[in-house]
Amino acid sequence: MPRRPPRVCSGNQPAPVPAMEPATDGLWAHSRAALARLEKLLRCSRCANILKEPVCLGGCEHIFCSGCISDCVGSGCPVCYTPAWILDLKINRQLDSMIQLSSKLQNLLHDNKDSKDNTSRASLFGDAERKKNSIKMWFSPRSKKVRYVVTKVSVQTQPQKAKDDKAQEASMYEFVSATPPVAVPKSAKTASRTSAKKHPKKSVAKINREENLRPETKDSRFDSKEELKEEKVVSCSQIPVMERPRVNGEIDLLASGSVVEPECSGSLTEVSLPLAEHIVSPDTVSKNEETPEKKVCVKDLRSGGSNGNRKGCHRPTTSTSDSCGSNIPSTSRGIGEPALLAENVVLVDCSSLPSGQLQVDVTLRRKSNASDDPLSLSPGTPPPLLNNSTHRQMMSSPSTVKLSSGMPARKRNHRGETLLHIASIKGDIPSVEYLLQNGNDPNVKDHAGWTPLHEACSHGHLKVVELLLQHNALVNTPGYQNDSPLHDAVKSGHIDIVKVLLSHGASRNAVNIFGVRPVDYTDNENIRSLLLLPEENESFSTSQCSIVNTGQRKNGPLVFIGSGLSSQQQKMLSKLETVLKAKKCMEFDSTVTHVIVPDEEAQSTLKCMLGILSGCWILKFDWVKACLDSKVREQEEKYEVPGGPQRSRLNREQLLPKLFDGCYFFLGGNFKHHPRDDLLKLIAAAGGKVLSRKPKPDSDVTQTINTVAYHAKPESDQRFCTQYIVYEDLFNCHPERVRQGKVWMAPSTWLISCIMAFELLPLDS
């Protein structure tokens, strides 16, 4: 058998090029080749372009743009024809984030290319699919079902057969909804059919021009229901809905994914605005009231998209609008439409949910879980309309005043997220700055307990974190499961944010509900070296919270209650009530802000202890005398009872957990000195839980509980004790002593002493 000759490479002959070596020379050649292969994998299975809002049908592995499968929803895959249910449709937010990161990497690698190449790539990743149909889906907390709306435009991006040309103008996608359709009055259906027969080829633009020529009534409202129905009857693919009046200072949550139940049947054409474009100052709204609705909207639409890529317009309050019962849900991403429909879009305002419909889903949040939610906003660059002349004029105009207090707090989505939460999640720096400048609370919590600072630290938006801290965001406020912003930054590995938080007084020893410190969440040596340094600036957050809440205390209502006062002191307190226009209570409730005691020490009365646990001002009676002499409200800090009352107030201002957070109590035996009902009220006010059955120290279920008490001292074994058996210790009869693992025996006097000192005191052996 002949031997194979050995392969010899001559020194004058270059070695063969590897298979992955690209043909072009230059820096990062292998990275460009790998990125090109990645782009091929990130293409739509139908249009072969870079994916835009990637969607999978659930029955196969094909991934499409959300606009490419609007005609296949509920039928099957257009590539492999696999049947697919409409409820299996799912938006892949993780893949969308990967596409955006790929776009950023592409811009870094091709910054030396020609400007034409950069322009083509920017358009490829930015607006390549803006003229396609888009499907929007959301989860309705009221009906517990997923709903879908297909947005239809009148421009075809792909060639169609000739027989479909005539049907294109007035076509509308219809599919089986997840919920039964809302009943439509017969008169409205008859009017719609009659209008369709009389005007079969009338365009939306022509109808809108006719609407502007109609004479206005005296009060600019419809006189009868029939006229209102005729106003809503329009042929073609759009259904204009009359806009309800906007209250001054009101903020639209259309971009933040507020969930509102739809009351109009059919597919509604709508537009989603960038976040900052939804914020309209009161003066701007009042100026727009002087002009008709449609002229102003058309003007804003034209100015908002000069290149045909319109993202949205300001929605003014008009006198010609009437309140419509149609609430249109929207996803949080802006969807571009061609300029042909810019003059024909009538935007609909969405009202906020009633408090009874707000739901908490804290287990389906964050990162991978939150990325699959159609309502969550994927990280992205700031909206392009923030740089246009209209927005710059609005930002620099003196008419941009602060929003009315309380209005932003009521605008929440079904998770309790405000506009500031959504902007912090997206990393939208201009919107965050605008919201903070207009009085939005940086320490507001959603239903899970997360603040905007938590969201910014978790998603790695350093500039947003710095903005929030500049506007007095609290650095140690715990969120869900008592995780602090430092916990989120460390778990996500953002070392720059960790440095910023530590420089602003973030606690290195803060623990969550499982007793885990931030340093226990990382193996990064650089982050661990920062977290293992000794504590500094311990008083920073304390002084910070005093600055934050000073204005709130001055502007808030005053509610007094006296504890242990004489009849003469009660009369003087009633006189102060008239002078300061305050309110005086006889029984303690949640509205009490000031508890007045006669001496320099707090008393162990029920009113005083409830005031301490609620974080109220516990003041000496000298404060009442000083206010009566000066006829104004004096500073409370000079007259505050030191010790436990002061610690409790600072704990409340820092939004920290209550005293007995993570603790469980079983009241055993009879209680005479402090009645059982009073002890139950105190435990509930302190955040503790009451057990109806005596805990068993030798039970494996009891001893395997891995939660800790938040306010226990870190170096003590009391941190891991979470269940207390409380007994009355003022009698000679004492129960058997129990101090085993999670279960300890504690006297009732210890419970009262902890409340008065507002700390978990050590138990004597």
From Swiss-Prot:
Gene3D superfamilies reported for this sequence: Ankyrin repeat-containing domain (1.25.40.20), BRCT domain (3.40.50.10190), Zinc/RING finger domain, C3HC4 (zinc finger) (3.30.40.10)
Q: Where is this region: Flexible linker?
A: 542-546
List Phosphothreonine occurrences by residue: T381
Task: Tell me yes or no: is Ribosomal protein among this UniProt entry's keywords.
Answer: no
* BRCT domain mapped to chain residues: 549-641, 655-765
Reaction(s) this enzyme catalyzes, per UniProt: S-ubiquitinyl-[E2 ubiquitin-conjugating enzyme]-L-cysteine + [acceptor protein]-L-lysine = [E2 ubiquitin-conjugating enzyme]-L-cysteine + N(6)-ubiquitinyl-[acceptor protein]-L-lysine
Q: Where is this region: Required for BRCA1 binding?
A: 20-113
Q: Name one GO cellular component term.
A: nucleus
- UniProt keyword list: ANK repeat, Cytoplasm, DNA damage, DNA repair, Isopeptide bond, Metal-binding, Nucleus, Phosphoprotein, Repeat, Transferase, Ubl conjugation, Ubl conjugation pathway, Zinc, Zinc-finger
Q: Which gene encodes it?
A: Bard1
- Which residue ranges are recorded for the region named Disordered? 183-229, 299-328, 369-410
Posttranslational mods: Processed during apoptosis. The homodimer is more susceptible to proteolytic cleavage than the BARD1/BRCA1 heterodimer.
Q: Where is the composition biased (Polar residues)?
A: 316-328, 391-403
Q: Spell out the subcellular localization from the entry.
A: Nucleus; Cytoplasm
Q: Please give the Gene Ontology molecular function terms for this protein.
A: protein heterodimerization activity; protein homodimerization activity; RNA binding; ubiquitin-protein transferase activity; zinc ion binding
Residues where Phosphoserine is found: S378
List the PANTHER family hit by this protein, alphabetically.
ANKYRIN REPEAT DOMAIN-CONTAINING PROTEIN 39-RELATED (PTHR24171), BRCA1-ASSOCIATED RING DOMAIN PROTEIN 1 (PTHR24171:SF8)
Tell me the protein's name. Answer: BRCA1-associated RING domain protein 1
- Alphabetized PROSITE patterns for the sequence: ANK_REP_REGION (PS50297), ANK_REPEAT (PS50088), BRCT (PS50172), ZF_RING_1 (PS00518), ZF_RING_2 (PS50089)
- The record's ANK repeats, renumbered to this chain, cover 415-447, 448-480, 481-513, 514-534
Where do Basic and acidic residues bias regions lie? 207-229
What pathway is it annotated to?
Protein modification; protein ubiquitination
Q: List, alphabetically, the Pfam families matched.
A: Ank_2, zf-RING_6
